[in-house]
Amino acid sequence: MFSAPLRRMMRVTKDEQIQPNSNAPENRKWFPRAPRPLRQFLDTLPRIGTAGSRSATLHVEDEQSPLGATLFDVATGASSINDRDTDASGLEPEKIRRFAWLRLIGTMGALMIAFGALGAGALPVVNNPYVDFPGGNFMSRMLQTSSMIVLIGVGFLVLAWVLMAPLVGIPFKRSGNRTASVSLSMLRRTFGAWVAPIMLTAPLFTQDIYSYLAQGSVTAQGMDAYAGGPLELLGPDNHLARSVPFIWAQSPSPYGPVALSIAASISVITNDSIVGGVLAHRIASLLGVVAAGWAITMLARRCRVSEEASFYLGVLNPLLILHLIGGIHNESILLGFLLVGLELGLRGTDRIQTGLWGPAWTYIALSGVLISCAGLVKVTGFIGLGFVGMALARAFHARGHRHVVAIGVAGLVQVAALVITVVVLSVITGISLGWITGQGGAATIRSWMSMTTNIGVISGFIGMNLGLGDHTAAMLVVTRAAGIAVAAAFMVRMLFATYRGHIHAVGGLGVATFVLVILFPVVHPWYMLWAIVPLASWANRLFFQLGVIAYSTAFSFFVLPRGLALPVGTVFSIYFGAALGFSILLLVGWWSLRRNPTFGLH
């Protein structure tokens, strides 16, 4: 009935899988002995603990899930079976009714966001097509009112999401129930209901989409998007170039050939239509999020974490819906490639451990290609190659290979996948390698969310007040470089922690990316999704989950719908009016529900 390798795997007992052997990476000292003076110096340094030991505490093992079943489930496909998706008859009617109301409240918020965006969204500078939408001409004349409607909608969307937390097993107090009361399919349908209205409206919270459209047109016309900015290449009369934010209008594209080839395809298909291009880019973003959602649930099963809680934090998150779908950022495509590649890579390592070499190499090759494609959207995607590589090296070592051989072979496999992917895509698309030298353009922005930027600006300010002159630019170079160096060192530490088994590859990737975002020269609210989305499928401590809820709730309101700065008085009136309107609607809704407590839908 089973193949010989599978029968051998099934004979492995639980104790044999749990007990580490003497040759395991974590049980052998494999670093060369340092010279005595160096050892004496190292002894004087503060102890920072074993690599990954603190980060690993974000994950709590579920004692009800036997480790011995893991390889069998993965190899036979049993881990893909989920009774909660096929049978919701055991769910409590009261909780189903409550969830249905929350879904409806969130959908109402999404509809308000979509309607308000017709006047408050990131509209094109010329030939605005959204005035022809129902209500668009009317809303476009009222920037402040439209912005209030969007923010009120964000309020209801966020409120519904936050109140769903206990229903997915994330209580607001430590003694609460950690078991999900709703099924994964219910959460997926909720995601569809919340995203559908936003798919059809104007861009939100950023003008970046016009850079994507312009760069796609540049690439489709056979020009090099790395040779100049959209304004230079398309000309000042081009309707796409005129809508690109001034700061990026003369900047080369920082994105890789995968992002540019997608944008070029959309340019050809839509004939540079703004409405068609926005919708097509949104569809691409949605496909990326859907792929990431599939991978999140697979990784959650692998890590023995609640799939419902993982999907709730990583996909249903309003920060993701508002900025990756509403704002149409390339991070959605990046995360789709990255997480699917991560799951396939770990499937390959599982099969190496069980001796299924043929399927293993197929999965590993696909993983390398997909993660390389993630890096060819934005270079931060390449980080995934390192963590899959260390998981692969760990699997090689478990088969009896020496440490140097295991790490060396795994590294060569990942480098080969990267090089082959870059060469093949460059040849097929005809896009140059300018993305390699085109990084760093975003560093011209002084982002208030960036710790290293803030330190540099404060240092320059102190220097000016001390009469030392304005050295802010020089200090920014120093502080930002120091931040990247620290993040790189921490990433190397997490890579070796992954190899030694102190932290799961998913956790190592998420924690390393979190530190990178904290120390990055430029940080936007949605950048934290680089870490939140992978960590959602591994980190199950209540502290982490509530932290994600708090961060996502707060930063869902930090960017105005138009994505541009407005006068202080205007900003105050928008937020004050939105808060007042939200409070009134909330009180009216609460009063209505109190009068009709049994009314509900599902």
Curated annotation (Swiss-Prot):
GO terms for molecular function: glycosyltransferase activity. Disruption phenotype: Cells lacking this gene are unable to synthesize lipoglycans (LM-A, LM-B and lipoarabinomannan (LAM)). Belongs to the MptA/B family. It comes from the Bacteria. Keywords: Cell wall biogenesis/degradation, Glycosyltransferase, Membrane, Transferase, Transmembrane, Transmembrane helix. Its main location: membrane. GO terms for cellular component: membrane. Its EC number is 2.4.1.-. Involved in the initiation of core alpha-(1->6) mannan biosynthesis of lipomannan (LM-A) and multi-mannosylated polymer (LM-B), extending triacylatedphosphatidyl-myo-inositol dimannoside (Ac1PIM2) and mannosylated glycolipid, 1,2-di-O-C16/C18:1-(alpha-D-mannopyranosyl)-(1->4)-(alpha-D-glucopyranosyluronic acid)-(1->3)-glycerol (Man1GlcAGroAc2), respectively. Catalyzes the addition of alpha-(1->6)-mannose residue. Pathway: Cell wall biogenesis; cell wall polysaccharide biosynthesis. The lineage of its organism: Bacteria, Bacillati, Actinomycetota, Actinomycetes, Mycobacteriales. The chain crosses the membrane at residues 105-125, 148-168, 190-210, 244-264, 274-294, 320-340, 368-388, 404-424, 448-468, 472-492, 503-523, 546-566, 571-591. It is an enzyme of class 2 (transferase). This is Alpha-(1->6)-mannopyranosyltransferase B.
